[in-house]
Structure formats: structure tokens, C-alpha cells
């Protein structure tokens, strides 16, 4: 609560308090703080109404975790994010024409520098990451046999309603011979969901909604009359499967996208506050703020 505290100090304090509260240490839980038992303000925050696909997914799962979850993340989460960032950098570099071997060498060197593990574990991590990059490269090569690469890391800024604007970056955008666009989203996790989950995948649906209200000028997707679509695909080169993992989503109808779009304005309201919803979902057991969540016993 010290206004002079920095962002790092506040996050560390929140992380430690969450751990103390989980251990039932008296006074650690915010409910036991007399100064924190009432609402500090009733005035909503001013927001732009911009939502990224990942933000939409997080807010639909649990608004409370979407807003506060990052203050209690552990160091392993940071390493996972850095691993994903480097893999995406490689995917982008080869898409822009950089020599794949040179790009891999640079990314592997960066990945090794962020490791703080024993030598035996380092070798395993390097081999695993190298395989992920090789499989991502192979998927990219195969995907361009019958389709044209329209762009990589494409900025998206499309207003889909008066209240909501979708913003973010598409990893890749492919175009078939008839001019239909396919959204490609690279996932760097070690496991992939069941194929049936693709049809309802929120991030792909959000990208499709943006394309349905957008136009592509060769560099970015902006407000427009709508683009012809093939749907979307999640690519999992790091999954422990023989074949490179793919989860597909078909081209959604205007009715399906309209129904999905109706879910978004309430998410903007959640971000504005001053009150926010806590919602049970399948990830509650591993939520970093479970110990202070009002819907958990």
C-alpha cells in the first residue's frame, strides 16, 4: 500500500502475502486488513475498450485472474514466457526471409543464456528447444506449398462494435488461391488440447471476428468491410507427438461470430471496475491467487 513502492516490489509483496495466506498465517489475507474491507472507489477506470485475443480468453475464464493473476506468478512462468518469445522470434525471422540456420543459432544462444540449471538439465532443455525450432521451420515450409504467406507478426486493430476494439498481432496469415485467409497461431507448450476443442477456441474465434470486420493492406489488418476466411489453426511444434500438432477451427458463420461478439462488451466493463468477477473454471486448482479468491473455500 506504500505509494512510493515500485512495480517489482509490489508484485513481490503480493506474491509473498499469497503464500502466507495459503499457509493460514494470521493477518496475511486481505480480508483481515481493516483498511481493505471496503471499496476504495466507485469510479470506473477509463479504458480504450481494446482487447487482445489472449485477453479475451483470460477474461472469459476468470476476470479476477485475468487482472490480478500476474502479480503472483512464479519464476517458472517467466522462463516459459521467455521460451515462447524466442520461439516466436524465430518463427517471425524465417517468415521474413532470414536464413533459418542463422536465425536458429541466434535464438539458441539467447535461450542458453537465460538458463540457470545444472549441466545435465541444460543439455535436455537445449535439445528440446532445438527440436521445437526445427519442427516450427518444417511446418512453415509445408504450409507454403499450397498457400501464400501473406504476412508475419501482422498488427491487428479492428473495431468490432461501439464498445470493443480487437488489437494484437497475428503470428502468420496465409492466403489460398481463391483469396481466403487462414489465421496461424504458434503455441510453444509441450502438450496440445484435444482436436475437438479447436472449434470453440476463443483466441482463434477472436481473430476470425477481427477479419470479419477488417481489411488487409499487406501490412496490417484495420477497419474494413470484412475479409474472406478459411478459419484458423493452432500449431504445436513443441508437443510430444510424432506429427507436428495442429488444432483447426473452421470458418465461422456471421451468426456464430455475432453471437461471440456479444460476449465482449461485458469484458470491457470488467476491466473498468471498480468491481470484478471471480469465476470458477478448470484452471482453479493451479491459479496463483487461489488463496485470496472469494469463490474458493
Locate the predicted segments by residue.
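C-terminal, charged and often intrinsically disordered regions of DNA end-processing helicases
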Residues: 1-97, 148-150, 280, 289
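Active-site-proximal structural scaffolding
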Residues: 9-10, 49-52, 60-61, 80-84, ...
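Active-site-adjacent bridging/hinge elements
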Residues: 57-68, 104-108, 174-187, 236
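Short, contiguous acidic/charged loop-to-helix segments that flank catalytic cores in large enzymes
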Residues: 74-79, 120-128, 158-164, 189-202, ...
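A non-catalytic, helix-rich entry segment at domain boundaries
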Residues: 86-161, 245, 249, 255, ...
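Non-catalytic protein-protein interaction segments used by genome-maintenance enzymes to assemble
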Residues: 150-219, 227, 261
Amino acid at each position: 500500500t506504500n505509494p512510493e513502492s515500485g512495480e517489482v516490489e509490489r508484485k513481490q509483496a503480493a506474491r509473498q502475502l499469497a503464500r502466507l495466506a495459503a499457509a493460514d498465517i494470521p493477518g496475511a489475507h486481505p480480508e483481515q486488513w481493516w483498511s481493505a474491507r471496503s471499496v476504495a472507489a466507485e469510479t470506473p477506470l477509463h479504458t480504450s475498450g481494446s482487447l487482445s485475443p489472449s485477453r479475451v480468453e483470460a477474461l472469459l475464464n476468470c476476470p479476477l485472474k485475468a487482472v490480478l493473476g500476474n502479480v503472483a506468478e512464479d519464476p517458472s512462468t517467466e522462463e516459459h514466457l521467455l521460451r515462447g518469445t524466442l520461439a516466436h522470434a524465430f518463427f517471425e525471422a524465417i517468415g521474413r526471409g532470414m536464413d533459418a540456420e542463422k536465425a536458429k543459432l541466434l535464438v539458441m544462444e539467447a535461450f542458453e543464456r537465460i538458463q540457470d540449471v545444472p549441466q545435465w538439465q541444460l543439455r535436455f532443455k537445449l535439445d528440446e528447444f532445438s527440436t521445437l525450432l526445427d519442427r516450427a521451420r518444417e511446418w512453415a515450409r509445408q504450409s507454403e506449398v499450397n498457400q501464400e504467406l501473406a504476412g508475419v507478426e501482422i498488427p491487428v486493430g479492428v473495431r468490432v462494435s461501439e464498445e470493443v476494439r480487437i488489437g494484437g498481432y497475428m503470428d502468420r496469415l496465409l492466403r489460398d488461391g481463391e483469396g481466403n485467409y487462414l489465421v496461424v497461431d504458434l503455441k510453444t507448450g509441450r502438450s496440445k488440447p484435444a482436436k475437438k476443442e479447436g472449434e470453440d477456441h476463443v483466441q482463434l474465434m477472436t481473430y476470425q471476428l477481427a477479419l470479419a470486420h477488417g481489411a488487409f493492406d499487406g501490412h496490417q489488418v484495420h477497419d474494413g468491410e470484412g475479409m474472406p476466411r478459411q478459419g484458423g489453426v493452432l500449431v504445436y511444434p513443441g508437443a510430444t507427438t510424432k506429427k507436428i500438432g495442429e488444432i483447426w477451427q473452421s470458418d465461422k458463420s456471421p451468426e456464430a461470430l455475432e453471437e461471440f461478439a456479444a460476449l465482449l462488451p461485458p469484458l470491457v466493463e470488467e476491466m473498468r471496475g471498480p468491481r470484478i468477477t471471480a469465476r470458477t473454471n478448470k484452471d482453479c486448482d493451479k491459479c496463483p491467487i487461489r488463496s485470496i479468491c472469494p469463490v474458493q473455500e
